[in-house]
């Protein structure tokens, strides 16, 4: 199970797996993995984001 918080500093890359679901992840390289339909630049990612459809480019927190 993934940790609640990734251990890296904000903006740094980290070793989270592609399936990482860290809820408070601050890593630019990992953030996009917290919700597959969020863009990597989404600052709200991992805050209850829900993909609107499977394989969708839209999610509830960034669009």
From Swiss-Prot:
Classification via SUPFAM superfamilies: Metallothionein
Gene3D superfamilies for the chain? Metallothionein Isoform II
Q: Where, by residue number, does a divalent metal cation 5 bind?
A: 35, 37-38, 51
Q: Does the keyword tRNA processing apply?
A: no
Q: Where does a divalent metal cation 4 bind?
A: 34-35, 45, 49
The answer to whether keyword Metal-binding applies is yes
Report residues binding a divalent metal cation 6: 38, 42, 45, 62
Query: What's this protein's name?
Result: Metallothionein-2
Source organism per entry reads: Columba livia
């Amino acid at each position: 199970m993934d940790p609640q918080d990734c251990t890296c500093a904000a903006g740094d890359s980290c070793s989270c797996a592609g399936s990482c679901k860290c809820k408070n992840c601050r890593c630019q390289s990992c953030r996009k993995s917290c919700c597959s339909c969020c863009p990597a630049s989404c600052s709200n990612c991992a805050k209850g984001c829900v993909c609107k459809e499977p394989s969708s480019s839209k999610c509830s927190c960034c669009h």
